[in-house]
Design a protein with these regions (language model features):
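Extended, subdomain-level signal for the structured scaffold at the beginning of enzyme domains
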Residues: 1-106, 115-118
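Aromatic-residue-lined binding/catalytic grooves and analogous aromatic/hydrophobic interfacial grooves
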Residues: 110
């Protein structure tokens, strides 16, 4: 990332994620960008298959693209909630690992960190 290019983040959502966790990650980025008057950050929201993801409060969230179509990104951040064990499918985790290969940052929010630890 050059000093003038924005930091681009990809948030990978899993069913059962917390809206509050996602908003707590994105809103400070938005505020910093808006208050600075510069495009410091950009982000996209993804799911494994590109379909809508249902939050823990039962809100269906449309995503920008499926994980396989995520291109250049500075960080891949997994966001999952209480049902994280259901996401521990071999194919799903292999897809995440393939996409994460070579990325500068791989992170997890809420139980997304737990998924990464396994």
């Amino acid at each position: 990332m050059s000093p003038k290019s924005p930091l681009h983040l990809t948030f990978l959502l899993f069913d059962g994620f917390s809206n509050m966790v996602l908003a707590s990650a994105i809103e400070p980025l938005r505020a910093a960008r808006d208050l600075s008057g510069r495009r410091l950050f950009s982000w996209q929201v993804s799911s494994l298959d590109g379909g809508a993801v249902t939050s823990s409060s039962r809100l269906a969230i449309a995503v920008d693209l499926p994980l396989e179509r995520v291109g250049a990104t500075d960080a891949l951040i997994l966001v999952s909630g209480y049902g994280m064990r259901a996401h521990l499918q071999r194919d799903s985790m292999l897809a995440v690992l393939r996409k994460a290969r070579g990325l500068p940052v791989l992170g997890g929010l809420d139980t997304g960190a737990w998924l990464l630890a396994l």
